[in-house]
C-alpha cells in the first residue's frame, strides 16, 4: 500500500541511504500514486524506475518515459538490455536498435537535467557471451551523460572471482566512480559479489532491506552497510553517505519490513537476525560469558541487536 511504501521510504531516509528507488510510475496504481505525493526526504534522493524507450518511437513520444518525466523526481533509473541474446529473444530487435534505445533514452533525461542511471540488465552474462557488445551498451549510456552505469547480475549466477575480473576490465571503459553493482542471490553470493565489485572499482551498490527481491533475492543492505563500518578492509578505504551513528537502527529497520510484510523475521540473517548473537552450546556460552569476542565478530549493540543466551540440554 501507499502507507507501507512511505514507511519503508522513511526508514531508509532516516538510515541515510543515498538513493531510494520508489517504484515504476505508470506500472501500477500504487507506484503512480506514490510519486504523485510530495516527499520531503532529509538524506535520500528519490529515484523513479522504468525501462529504455521502445523501438520505432522517439524518446519524446514514449509513454513510459513520459510517465517517468512527469514523476518530477531528481533522479531517474532506466533498465536496458546488455546481453545480445536477450536483445534478440526477449526484445526481438537488432543489436543496433537496442543501442539507439539506450542512447536516446539517456540523452532525453540528461537533457532534462535529471541525474540519470542506467541499469545494464544481464550485464555479466552479456559480457561473458559477447564482451564487445555488452561494453558498447554501457558506453552508449555513459557517453550521453549517465551519472551511474549499474552492472547487473540479473540471473544471479556470476561468482565473486568473475565479478572482480569483469569489473576490472569494465573500469578501463567507464570510470569506477560512475559504476554500480546490482547483484542477485541465486548462488548465495549477492553480498560477496557486491563487495568484490567495490574492491574492483565500483562506487554504487544497489540492494534491498533483508535482501528482498525476485527468486532468491537481492544484495542485503542489512549485511552490506555494517560491513563498510565494522570491517577494517572496507572502513579504512571507503566512505558511505550513511552516518556511523545510524547503523544502530539497522535491526529495527530490518524488522519493520517483516512487520509490514506480515511475515516471520529470518532469525539467521547476518548482523540483524535474532540468532546472529544467540549462544546455546556449552563451550560457546562459557566462553562468551568470559569475553563475548570469543564467539562474536562484533558487538551486537553496534547494529541495534542483542546477545541471547539460550538455556538447553546443550548448555552444560
Residue ranges of each PLM-predicted region?
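Small-aliphatic-rich amphipathic alpha-helix that forms the alpha element of a beta-alpha
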Residues: 182-208
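Histidine/acidic-residue-rich catalytic or RNA/ligand-binding cores of hydrolases
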Residues: 163, 216-223
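Hydrophobic alpha-helical scaffolding
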Residues: 24-25, 95, 124-127, 156-160, ...
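Alpha/beta enzyme core
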Residues: 1-20, 35-37, 41, 54-179, ...
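Glycine-rich phosphate-binding loop at the start of an alpha helix
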Residues: 6, 135, 188-191, 218
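A mid-to-C-terminal "edge-of-domain" accessory segment
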Residues: 8-13, 226-228, 232-316
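A glycine-rich helix N-cap at a beta->alpha junction
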Residues: 45-50
Amino acid at each position: 500500500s501507499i502507507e507501507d511504501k512511505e514507511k519503508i521510504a522513511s526508514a531508509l531516509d532516516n538510515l541515510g541511504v543515498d538513493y531510494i528507488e520508489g517504484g515504476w510510475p505508470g506500472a501500477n496504481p500504487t507506484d503512480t500514486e506514490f510519486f504523485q505525493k510530495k516527499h520531503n526526504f532529509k538524506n535520500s534522493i528519490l529515484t523513479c524506475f522504468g525501462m529504455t524507450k521502445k523501438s520505432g518511437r522517439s524518446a519524446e513520444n514514449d509513454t513510459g518515459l513520459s510517465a517517468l518525466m512527469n514523476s518530477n523526481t531528481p533522479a531517474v533509473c532506466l533498465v536496458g538490455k546488455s546481453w545480445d541474446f536477450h536483445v534478440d529473444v526477449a526484445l526481438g530487435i537488432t543489436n543496433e536498435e537496442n543501442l539507439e534505445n539506450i542512447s536516446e533514452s539517456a540523452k532525453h533525461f540528461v537533457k532534462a537535467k535529471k541525474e540519470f542511471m542506467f541499469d545494464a540488465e544481464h550485464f555479466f552474462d552479456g559480457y561473458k557471451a559477447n564482451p564487445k557488445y555488452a561494453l558498447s551498451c554501457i558506453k552508449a549510456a555513459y557517453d550521453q551523460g549517465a551519472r551511474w552505469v549499474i552492472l547487473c547480475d540479473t540471473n544471479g549466477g556470476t561468482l565473486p572471482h568473475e565479478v572482480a575480473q569483469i569489473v576490472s576490465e569494465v573500469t578501463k571503459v567507464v570510470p569506477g566512480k560512475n559504476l554500480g553493482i546490482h547483484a542477485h542471490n541465486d548462488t548465495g553470493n549477492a553480498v560477496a559479489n557486491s563487495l568484490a565489485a567495490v574492491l574492483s572499482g565500483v562506487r554504487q551498490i544497489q540492494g534491498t532491506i533483508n535482501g528482498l527481491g525476485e527468486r532468491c533475492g537481492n544484495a542485503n543492505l542489512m549485511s552490506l552497510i555494517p560491513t563498510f563500518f565494522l570491517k577494517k578492509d572496507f572502513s579504512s578505504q571507503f566512505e558511505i553517505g550513511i552516518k556511523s551513528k545510524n547503523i544502530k537502527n539497522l535491526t529495527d529497520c530490518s524488522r519493520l519490513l517483516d512487520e509490514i510484510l506480515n511475515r516471520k523475521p529470518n532469525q539467521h540473517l547476518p548482523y540483524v537476525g535474532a540468532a546472529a548473537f544467540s549462544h546455546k552450546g556449552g563451550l560457546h556460552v562459557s566462553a562468551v560469558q568470559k569475553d563475548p569476542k570469543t564467539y562474536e565478530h562484533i558487538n551486537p549493540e553496534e547494529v541495534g541487536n542483542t546477545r541471547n543466551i539460550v538455556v538447553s540440554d546443550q548448555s552444560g
